[in-house]
Amino acid sequence: MKIACISLGCPKNQVDLDVMVHILLSAGHETVADLAEADVILVNTCGFIESAKTEAIENILEACSYKQQNPELKVIVTGCLAERYRSQIEEEIPEVDAVVGCASNKAIDTIVARLFHGEDHLESYGAKKDFPLGGKRVIGTPAHYAYLKIAEGCNNRCHYCAIPGIRGPLRSRDMADCVAEARWLAGEGVKELIVVAQDPTAYGEDWGKPGSICELLDKLNRVPGLEWIRIMYAYPERITDEFIAAMKRNEKVVPYLDLPIQHCNDTILKNMNRRSNRAELLEVIGKLRREIPGITLRTTLIAGFPGETEEQFEDLCNFVKEVKFDRLGCFAYSAEENTVAAKMDGQIDQETKDKRAELVMQIQTGIMAQKQAEKVGQTVHVLCDGIDEESGLYLCRTTGDAPEVDGNVCVSSEEPLYPGQFYDVLVDDSDLYDLYGTVAK
């Protein structure tokens, strides 16, 4: 069978899809890029917040529309939306042939076979403790970078977050298994390894070994062939002296962290069930910048959390001005069913939430413009991702730019640059998100 895949959501979801694609290929199926050619369309969904759910539903409906020209087409929905809304998907979109929960990913080949043996409207779910950790996979990203998922689930229980209800509690992946996959990825040509989980800094806590991320970084740093190791998502309360020391002693670990602080006001943080306060956040950020000069810090903020007053929002704005994060995203609070925050008093209207998020981003725009302009005249070390055919510029990234999240260094060069190769680039211009330059002589 010809299988087409639509991948939505976070890098962790991409890894799940990579495992499913490997299973399908091993069963004798083939993948195609064109949905119109497919016998099966697999929609791997995100269901984290309202905008992600909307995007997922739009893609499911698009996949189902191909049944008009191919009535035998099968549409399978997997991922977080499938896990979260089991019966609703089949009830509201009856054109869907199978809804597969995350714990059943490894049965995807059996589900495809059952569909083509005449069964329909299949549902397959397992216990959250059975969500697969690791497994043989394809590399669904460009060949020179890949995501390594080191854990599943989360124990943080933030009051706004639906993930523990979807993905279950923290289950850390065996360290030897993580290192073995990293070695395989490096052998396949991966130069940049991006370590992901809901909270990588919690790795090993379910074994009773907090701080195990430090040992894992030591081992990953010794994998031949890897050049950059990037840690995505680091919770402030787990940025210990030991963690900072591990970043410093392992030269392949790039000076980059995404700290999802969500807010800075002590009352709001407490209501979110976050474990840091404003003073502790400032201390951690200051220590990171002192100990790792040049580190790029990204964060995510929520505006309009239930009960957020004008004064508390102003506190957030002042914090953004004071800290000057290198990268920042601010989102209007999304009330997710079956979360504590959705039942709180003081829900804020959508217009106000959107306006507050926009104001934070306006502040960050000024900060970004200044930081970008300061890089003009510098020489930066970059990894080439490929070429933009329209502009003819090569798209590269510094250690401060995560793929698909941050900006690019757009390089003009008479000589060809190659994906997966490193270059030194002289920056001669900038805009809000990207730098521009030429290969340094």
Where are these regions (language model features)?
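Short acidic/polar active-site loop segments enriched in Thr and Asp
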Residues: D97, K191, E227, D326, ...
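Radical SAM enzyme [4Fe-4S]-AdoMet core and its adjacent flexible, acidic
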Residues: C10, Y203-G225, M272, A335-G366
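Terminal RNA-binding accessory module
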Residues: K343-K441
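Active-site proximal loops enriched in glycine and acidic residues that flank catalytic Cys/His/Asp
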Residues: A197, Y233, I261-H263, T299-A303, ...
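Conserved SAM/AdoMet-binding glycine-rich loop
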Residues: V75-G79, R84, I89, G187-E311, ...
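Conserved, mostly hydrophobic/aromatic
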Residues: C178, V195, I231, L259, ...
